[in-house]
Every structure is written in C-alpha cells, then in structure tokens.
C-alpha cells in the first residue's frame, strides 16, 4: 500500500497537504446529520467541535464514580495497560477500557456519540483505542504537541485520515488546569516528522512523547495559518470531538483542580489497520485494536 503520509523517514521536517476529506458524508445530506450545519461547518473548518452539556449531571456522576473505582481497583496492579507518570507511580492513563469494563463498553456504544461519528466518517465504525486520562491537581504532567494520526499511521498502520477522537470531560475544564489545546485548521496539514521509530517505542511515548513531535517552525506555521490556539473549556459532561490529524497538546496542571477525561477513538471500518508504515513491529492490541473489533453500525 502506498504511503500517502510519510513520516520519520527523513532528516528534515516537511508540511504536506491533507489528501482526505474531513467530513465523509456528502454535505448535500447535512439535513440528515445529528448535529447542525453550523456545527458541521465548524468541525470541517477547525478540525474539532465541542458540544457542551452533552451528558447529563447524573451521567457524569456515574462516569466519575466509575473511573475512580477502576483506578482504585488497579492502583497496585502491574499491567501494561496502566500508564504511570514518569516521575512517580501515579496512574496517568488506563487503556482498553471499552473492552475490559462493561460500563465503559456501554459508553463507547452510546448512540448519541455514534450517530455523530458515523455521519462524520461516512461509515460504520469500531473503537481503535480507548483510555481514561487522569490529570490530578498539582501533579498532572504536560503532553507535547502532536497529531494522533501521525503516530497511528507510522506505528499502527492506519492508512488514511478517517478516524475521530472523542474526549468526554469528567472534570470542569478551565483555561488553567492543563487543558486540551488545539490548533484550528491544522488537520488540513500533515507534519512529516524527523527521527526513526525503534521497536517498543510506545513504552516511552505513552509517558512522554519524543518521536512524532513536530518541530517548532512547523508549529509556528500551523498556528499562523489557523490564527492561534483554541482551548475548549466547560463543565464536566462536555464532549470534544477532534479529527485524527488535528494538532493538539496540553500543559502540566499546577492548579488544585483536576482534569480527567474518558477518551475514545473511532475508526472507519473502511480504514482498518494494515502493517505499520514504519516497517516496525505492531503495537499491542490494547493500544491499537486489530483482532477484536465490535462494529458499531446504525443497525445495532
């Protein structure tokens, strides 16, 4: 298969134009979408969309309870699915929750989310990756700028830009508690990064990403084109959907206010993983689902 988005192959970074649609369902069918035309326009232009108060207060309480019960149950468990902060033993992320936990399986199968995702991707979908992210007050560490698609393409073999990340806020998101930051319009440009991917790179990158991180000049250019940086803020229960190639990152959290979220990545069934474009070993199933792929269709 031709590599349309080569990265980590040269000693100089390069910005390539996107070769894929942003919204896969024809825009003539906007009236059939579960979101408004204005929301579709915003997603297509910016590469992300925040929907505030998506989940009710009761649903948020249930999800908050579930993420902390799971965290407490495995705090002393040694598991590759549990990622801990690089300078402590605090849990940073728990992966593969959509298949390992019945409650989060139900959340992944929420019709309200699936209707939007299926419309944007123009097909049935499956969960490529799921995780809970914990960013406690005073301790939560930063995560450098990156495009998820760059990693999924190079290390997992995701062929095209036909996936969407859904971040469910389970804490109030402020502009100061290590929030998600996104560069508007960056999904239209692929930053081909420098470096060579070693086997098992994920063991380090999930704690602190060093490869697949864009250079400063490319980031300056993306922010110039996009007109700056956006920070979705809002109450717990808000949902932010962002396109697989949207450049994003977050700062450390030095405030008393935690920022926790449930993160689901939906990939089109027409965009299933092939061999990693790095030529290296496949990442584990709990990071990049290949084998067990329950398909979320309009029928079920």
UniProtKB/Swiss-Prot annotation:
Field pH dependence: Optimum pH is 7.5.
Protein name from the UniProt record: Ectoine dioxygenase
GO biological process assignments: ectoine catabolic process
Domain of life: Bacteria
Matches recorded under NCBIfam families: ectoine_ThpD
Molecular function terms from GO: 2-oxoglutarate-dependent dioxygenase activity; iron ion binding
Regions that span the bilayer: none
Sites annotated Important for ectoine stabilization: 152
Temperature-activity note from the record: Optimum temperature is 32 degrees Celsius. Active from 5 to 50 degrees Celsius.
Free-text comment on the cofactor: Binds 1 Fe(2+) ion.
Entry similarity comment: Belongs to the PhyH family. EctD subfamily.
Protein's UniProt keywords contain Iron: yes
Keyword terms of this UniProt record: Dioxygenase, Iron, Metal-binding, Oxidoreductase
Coiled-coil residue windows: none
Binding site for Fe cation: 146, 148, 248
Pfam families: PhyH
Protein task: Involved in the biosynthesis of 5-hydroxyectoine, called compatible solute, which helps organisms to survive extreme osmotic stress by acting as a highly soluble organic osmolyte. Catalyzes the 2-oxoglutarate-dependent selective hydroxylation of L-ectoine to yield (4S,5S)-5-hydroxyectoine.
């Amino acid at each position: 298969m031709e590599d349309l988005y080569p990265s980590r192959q040269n000693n100089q970074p390069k910005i390539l134009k996107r070769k894929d649609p942003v919204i896969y369902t024809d825009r003539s069918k906007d009236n059939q979408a579960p979101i408004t035309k204005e929301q579709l326009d915003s997603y297509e232009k910016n590469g992300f969309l925040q929907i505030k108060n998506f989940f009710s207060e009761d649903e948020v309480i249930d999800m908050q309870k579930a993420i902390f019960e799971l965290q407490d149950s495995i705090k002393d468990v040694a598991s590759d699915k549990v990622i801990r902060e690089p300078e402590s033993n605090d849990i940073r992320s728990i992966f593969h929750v959509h298949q390992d936990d019945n409650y989060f399986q139900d959340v992944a199968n929420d019709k309200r989310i699936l209707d939007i995702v299926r419309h944007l991707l123009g097909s049935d979908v499956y969960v490529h990756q799921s995780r809970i992210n914990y960013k406690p007050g005073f301790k939560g560490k930063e995560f450098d700028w990156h495009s998820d698609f760059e990693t999924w393409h190079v290390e997992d073999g995701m062929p095209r830009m036909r996936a969407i990340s859904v971040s469910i806020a389970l804490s109030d998101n402020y502009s100061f508690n290590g929030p998600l930051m996104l560069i508007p319009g960056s999904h239209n440009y692929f930053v081909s990064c420098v470096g060579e991917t070693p086997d098992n790179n994920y063991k380090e990158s999930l704690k602190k990403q060093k490869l697949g991180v864009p250079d400063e000049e490319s980031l300056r250019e993306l922010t110039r084109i996009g007109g700056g940086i956006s920070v979705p803020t809002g109450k717990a229960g808000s949902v932010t959907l962002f396109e697989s190639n949207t450049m994003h990152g977050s700062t450390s959290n030095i405030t008393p206010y935690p920022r926790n979220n449930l993160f689901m990545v939906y990939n089109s069934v027409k965009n299933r993983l092939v061999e990693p474009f790095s030529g290296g070993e496949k990442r584990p199933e709990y990071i990049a689902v290949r084998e067990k792929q329950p398909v979320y269709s309009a029928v079920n």
